[in-house]
């Protein structure tokens, strides 16, 4: 047993040393890096940067609000349990003195910035636990023109709604893997294309957990594969206010989930959908304690009648982007000389 633990420790150490060696920029609060704050590291990247810049962030509690204003950046934490970015910001409070949402989150991605990756980090907006208000508070916020965003092996948490708000309605493409998401109403709420797999969700509200806006393209979709959903007793799965399309494949729901299908929520003034309310598809999804009829298999009702094996990154993003290939290339840089 001791040999196994020692081998595991050595493998972790080797992986850490390789990431450290391959990083373009190192952030360390103890002064043993290029910068002691993440924002200073981000600011050091050239505006003309066209290749991925790997910023390695050593363990620490980073009480920072981040503004990402350059493309092609990879933020890699030493360990998601101990590399923590935390800041308290309430959206409505921010908007009292600011014209838009840029700056309302912990991580703020400027319009038209592309190709950003977050790996092995905790990102948390803790306004609610500090001040008792669980209204909208972003952990990550992005808007127009922001696309090709990867979140891998991360905890993304907010003490309010809209935890992960990637809102490029035109053609946003987002991929999240092996993550934990937590929040209140609509806490994972992409616009455009989004693919999440091998991840866990925890919701604290009785309104909705996931949300989607696919109103500008009939092919926009929110796909969740091999995910686990949990929350407070009676938590609902999801809703949408505009045209949307959900695919849930091989997902598991805790017994706390309410008997309430993903629903079209009313707006004022009322919205008329272009493609109908029924574009919510399931395959092999089950609830602990017993299934509800509304999440039975119905993939054959989707346009093109896709089979489960067909639902991969290339299919989801229409062959425009394969984030799993990108992620593997990034990780290969960490282990090239292992």
Predicted regions and their residues:
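Sequence-level preference for short, compositionally simple segments enriched
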Residues: 24-32, 36-338
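Bacterial Sec-dependent N-terminal signal peptides
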Residues: 1-24
């Amino acid at each position: 047993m001791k040999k196994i633990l020692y081998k595991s420790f050595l493998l972790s150490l080797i992986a850490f040393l390789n990431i450290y060696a391959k990083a373009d920029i190192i952030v360390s609060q103890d002064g043993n890096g290029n910068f002691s704050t993440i924002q200073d590291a981000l600011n050091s990247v050239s505006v003309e940067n066209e290749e991925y810049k790997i910023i390695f962030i050593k363990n620490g509690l980073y009480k920072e609000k981040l503004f990402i204003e350059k493309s092609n950046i990879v933020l890699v934490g030493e360990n998601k349990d101990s590399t923590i970015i935390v800041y308290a910001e309430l959206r409505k409070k921010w908007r009292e003195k600011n014209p838009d949402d840029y700056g309302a989150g912990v991580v703020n991605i400027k319009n038209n910035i592309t190709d950003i990756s977050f790996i092995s980090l905790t990102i948390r907006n803790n306004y609610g636990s500090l001040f008792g208000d669980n209204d909208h508070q972003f952990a990550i916020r992005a808007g127009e023109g922001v696309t090709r965003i990867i979140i891998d092996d991360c905890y993304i948490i907010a003490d309010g709604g809209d935890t992960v708000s990637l809102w490029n309605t035109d053609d946003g493409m987002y991929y999240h893997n092996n993550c934990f998401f937590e929040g209140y109403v609509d806490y994972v709420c992409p616009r455009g294309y989004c693919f999440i797999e091998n991840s866990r969700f925890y919701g604290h509200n009785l309104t909705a957990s996931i949300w989607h806006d696919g109103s500008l393209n009939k092919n926009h979709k929110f796909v969740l594969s091999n995910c686990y959903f949990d929350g407070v007793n009676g938590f609902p799965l999801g809703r949408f206010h505009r045209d949307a399309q959900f695919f849930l494949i091989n997902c598991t729901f805790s017994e706390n989930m309410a008997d309430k299908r993903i629903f079209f929520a009313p707006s004022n003034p009322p919205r008329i959908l272009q493609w109908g309310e029924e574009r919510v598809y399931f395959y092999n999804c089950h609830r602990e304690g017993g299934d509800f009829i509304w999440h039975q298999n119905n993939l054959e009702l989707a346009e093109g009648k896709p089979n489960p094996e067909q639902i991969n990154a290339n299919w989801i993003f229409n062959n425009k982007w394969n984030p799993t290939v990108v992620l593997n290339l990034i990780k290969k840089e960490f282990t090239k000389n292992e």
